[in-house]
Amino acid sequence: MRIFSYLFSVTHQTACPCALLLSPASVTSRSLARARGHDAATGASMPPSSLYSSGRLLPARPTSSTTTTAGRWARPSCSLSMNGCAPGAGDRGAVCVREARALPAASAPQDAVGQLRAAVDALGAGAPTAAPSGIIRIEVPIRQRGDAIEWLHAQSALPRCFFSARAPLPERPALAGSSSDGNGNGGLNDHWQQPVSVAGVGSAVFFRGTNPFSLADWRAIKRFLSRDCPLIRAYGAIRFDATSDASVEWEDYGSFYFIVPQVEFNELEESSVLATTIAWDDSLSWTWQNAVNELQSTLEKISPCSVKVDKSNLQTTIMSLNHVPTKASWDLAVTKALQMIKGRQRELVKVVLARCSRYITDSCIDPVELLACLKVEGQNAYQFCIQPPDAPAFVGNSPEQLFHRKYLNISSEALAGTRARGKTRADDFKIGQDLLLSGKEDMEFTIVRDSITKKLQMICDEVVVHPRKALRKLPRVQHLSAQLTARIRNEDDEFDILNTLHPSPAVCGLPTEEARQFIRDYEIFDRGMYAGPVGWFGGAESEFAVGIRSALLGKGHSTLVYAGAGIVEGTNPSFEWDELDLKASQFAKLLRYQEQHICYQKAENMGTVI
């Protein structure tokens, strides 16, 4: 239990039956010491006011299912499911049935819901399948484009997920035989349409563990996936450091958490798809009839309509703001890191330190409404939301790709160095040139790019880096960026790609283990899924972003916003503190009615190339 465990009520009770399937993370004496207020950076005790507050991230749960005005914070209904990562599941081979079925197209979502309910009722009325395990996706095309976020906003079921691919990047190097643009958008030869955004609720099967994500866990997920059913996907996230203790706010996520949604809305370029997925496995004590019954229950709760979202702001103001660490503690931690970087033994080359900021607002923040606001200025970023049953929501707007795999083709990128956008075009150009020519920023960026290149070369053939250095311009910030492509030798190398690329020097440091140990020693909060892999596994392809520019929201007036900065030789602690503010500004802007010192500009995919 770390310092931020006070954000959740210590009387936290399991009200949701789904939570009975999940084991809480252990609490060690070291983590308890952190919760009592020991600041690793200063060696001193934190003042009580920094540990406790009357503000509650999770208020007492209602005793009955009620809907509040405007549909906000209605008590969600939780679907029962099976944990596909039971011991030995990864050794059992593929499930017996992996199938996708398409029903006739519908003119509107309301008609699609009716078709799915009828199809699942027919499954329940028929004879049980003889197959002891399987997964079936049933989908209804809709002849109009719907908004996946607005569909999700109308739903009350948990768990839920959302993932939106970013706009394609130009100038990504191509490999022979590649038909992917490296952003999960596929190519011209795809025989299925790639979703622009996917929203899902319920879990046909979930995958959760408290040990680090392993090859056996990856195989347990892949049992349910198939090239022939490319849109059956497992969406979720992995902890930044699964060997560290999870604090209370992150306990329900385990060390990793993925779901194949029971009901899913796919937003396409010109149309939509509403789909439902049923999964069963007798060996996991989840029979066909269990799965049918639970899916029928979830479908009865699905709203056939969408709910409009105000995407301009959240109509809420900040009442208080506290940072962990404080500015003084941050300066001491950065100074200690610089001592190790410049020391005789050169124990560190780079370390990335992070900050967790607690915002208390005058009203509750709906995670889906926050997601919608982030998406407005996030065309060059991945938007995501993961929320297990009875847990806070992890929401983000990440510009950074960890990797994308399509068949044997891999794409990745290096992203480091940060500057604000300029108030005018001329000012913006000048700031960008300063970033390109900065020796300190070039050192940080080169460390990241060269490390990722070497990691890919260990597993892949044909590693290509182009451009080697360019500007990535986002609405509020700009970064140095490089694009990488490679080719794995077989699809089973996907786990090695994930395991090798995470954590990258962009979010951890170099050497990896030394940087990770420094973070364990000097960060006094739990990163949880922040800076970890966030994305999806599929049969034909998979894609993961790095879970940065993210926040954790529970049912209450408190929100945790995470940001990090790279520390290398030449770093100025105060400049890096300002960089944290800059990276968190997309959240701060939405939590206030206006932000005076941040300039908003339209995102551009690429700027000057070197």
For the regions a protein language model found, what residue spans apply to each?
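Glycine-rich, N-terminal phosphate-binding loop and its surrounding beta-alpha-beta segment
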Residues: 156-253
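Small/polar glycine-rich anion-binding or flexible loop at a beta-alpha turn
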Residues: 530-540, 602-605
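Cytosolic ligand/metal-binding cores
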Residues: 90-110, 132-138, 203-209, 268-305, ...
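N-terminal organelle-targeting presequences
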Residues: 62-154, 175-176, 183-185, 601, ...
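Non-catalytic accessory segments adjacent to catalytic cores
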Residues: 43, 47-48, 54-55, 69-73, ...
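N-terminal chloroplast transit peptides
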Residues: 1-71, 80
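Functionally critical, mid-to-C-terminal surface segments that flank or help form catalytic/ligand
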Residues: 471-531
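Active-site pocket-lining segments that scaffold enzyme catalytic pockets across diverse folds
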Residues: 308-401, 445-448, 452, 459, ...
